[in-house]
Amino acid sequence: MLHVLASLPLLLLLVTSASTHAWSRPLWYQVGLDLQPWGCQPKSVEGCRGGLSCPGYWLGPGASRIYPVAAVMITTTMLMICRKILQGRRRSQATKGEHPQVTTEPCGPWKRRAPISDHTLLRGVLHMLDALLVHIEGHLRHLATQRQIQIKGTSTQSG
């Protein structure tokens, strides 16, 4: 439980938005890295048409946008917390000498059901992350077609 409390300030830093004067672009712009998967960086601010890479898009005044990376980090953190809780339950049952009872009734009480395996839990989280990435990709493609922004890897050859 102490690990969870220690990670709360980090989660709060990820969720809260910074001032627009301090960070007008995501962190990878500040350090000069090209980590954007959609790659729509304008040559200059004047050529910016309000796209994803424009200053102020990610952290605008009053905006509460959250980075997709932060969403994945929060999901991963929650998965780790759930895993620790499940491990603690299993350890406490093992020290008491109790074994989980398995019932064939689908509507039996929750305590009588077999515990969910780590494989099943991990599979569910991976499906959730996959759905999140598909949603982000669809949103970025929609923005690219809406604003005529060229996506990295696609070429517009004429002739």
From Swiss-Prot:
Subcellular location field: Membrane
Ranges facing Extracellular side: 25-63
Regions crossing the membrane: 64-86
Signal peptide: 1-24
Positions of the UniProt region annotated as Disordered: 91-110
Cytoplasmic side: 87-159
This protein's UniProt keywords: Membrane, Signal, Transmembrane, Transmembrane helix
Membrane topology (UniProt): Single-pass type I membrane protein
GO cellular component, one term: membrane
Name the record gives this protein: Transmembrane protein 89
Organism: Homo sapiens
